Amino acid sequence: ARRFQSGFAAGISGDPEDTEKHPWDMFELSKHPDNLLRFVDDDIPGLTTPWVYCGMLFATFCWHVEDHYLASVNYAHKGSAKTWYGIPGSDAEKFEAIAKTAVPSLFKENPDKLHHITMLVPPGQLIENKIKIVKLVQKPGDFVVTFPRAYHSGFSHGFNVGEAVNFAPVDWIEMGRVACRNYVKGNGKRNAVFAHDRVVVTAAKSLKKIFETTKSRGKWMAHMSRVLRTDLETLADELENWQSILNGKQRGDGFIKGDPLRFYKCQNIPEMDGPEDCCVVCKAMPFAAVVRCECEFGRSFARCLQHWNRGCDCKQRHRMVEMRMEVDELRALAKSLEL
């Protein structure tokens, strides 16, 4: 769509010369005040900007969830219908367990097979295993919305043209945090495509600025404030815990032996996140704190706190933690959003 524009690009009148945006233009969705993806300072096709695509008879999209467990909206512009199957996010883990038992040999060879978007499990088999599943037929002019972590699959009845993009309402944040934790465990289908923590921090700073300049406290602000504060406190707690572990003050999971890691304050936080900001081990994208090493490889590539001792063979004393935000900063930002 970035190259050919949205299917709604002709504007309200349908005249190509009409510059007034159609109210359903999916490029406009990324700018909506309630869409947290507007804080992602990158053009990510299909995620922050829509994809326009064509289907054909029996063209299939296998079971999958969206990146970062985001919500999505899909519009059928023209052509034949499309059948969809959906599973609510509440049954996502149950579905994953059933999928692994359906073809155990495939998962033995490739544990993250489900995330390659190449697997179909018959709806009847899912129903037999008490998994909630819904079906719909999308016709031209119909919108289909998928909710965070809702697995979905389907197929086209013939040639058709559709358009889709992701979006992130404020209620997505909690599920986005779950996605981050699963990425760190190696349960993501590919690299994280943006830094969840950067989005939350940027959104919180934006809301704080609105509070300071307008003194407004609308209902939507109260809800957003509450959700952002909760996630910021969660991030601060996790960061504080890992600081305690990596400086040798706390025993437990990840406890280090020998010299504690060095911590230093990052003076120039990158304005955007790129592939080099992904953890070289799990492909998650840390933001508040990044582990580096003095070696050439370690200076160029990041590690998340959970994988501080992976990625190169250097001695522990050469590892250091680049602090982009301190625990106190995160807690102060959260407190500034109190109503």
Show where each model-derived region lies.
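Conserved N-terminal structural segment that caps and organizes enzyme catalytic cores in eukaryotes
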Residues: 1-143, 147-339
